[in-house]
Amino acid sequence: VAGVAWIDSKRTRLAYVPGLAEPPEISHRGPAEVPPNLRKSVVATFNGGFPLETSNAGLVYRGETVAEMVNGIATLVEYRDGRIDIVNWKHGPTPGPHIWFAKQNLPPIVYEGKLNPNLSDGPEWGATVNNAVRVWRSGLGIDRRGNLIYAAANYQTVGSLAEILQRAGAVRALELDINEDWTSFISYRHPGAGDPSNLLPEMFRPDTRYLTPDERDFFAVYKKPGKTE
């Protein structure tokens, strides 16, 4: 069973939240949890992708390059005008002034609506416990209208994860974290981060993750001002 969440880009905004230890070097770390003053509008949180030392890829935060960008890597981008996209990075190590944040993680698994033909069961898609091929995997895609699609499931290969995202409507997608320790998607039914719930009941981490400081970086989804349920 796969869990899939659709995130309406017109009614929400996305924020990158650094963790206590990841990324290791950053000028503005913040609280490493959903800030208490923003909990009134938080609707979801989810895992942020491989650590920089594992991905060997780029990160931009608040317009500042934390790790140099790498061509050919799938990249979740927020532009300074608030627009979100997932792109195959082709602009070299420097992001340019129009990018507010960018997080890279491995080559795209879906691009222009098609599966990456080079998806395999090898370690290039992440190290797994006991070298298992089918493990917990998560990914993020974007549909033709700019809405985000998160997917996670146990017993997945990178190829089957890509198929889940493609069938859910993603035209571009990247793999996020793998293995049960790192895969989390939590929604909040009430303001103030009330009544949290994991996307899948078998997810290993508690649904209170990200409401206390976490070692790893993550993404938070907030309702835009004036938008109702």
Question: What are these regions, as identified by a protein language model?
Answer:
Residues I86-V87, Y111-L115, W125-E229:
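Extended C-terminal subregions enriched in glycine
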Residues A32-P36, G63-A67, I73-T75, P97-H98, ...:
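A generic local secondary-structure boundary/capping motif
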Residues V1-A67:
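Zymogen propeptides
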Residues L20-A21, K90-T94, A152-T157:
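Short, solvent-exposed aromatic-acidic interface loops
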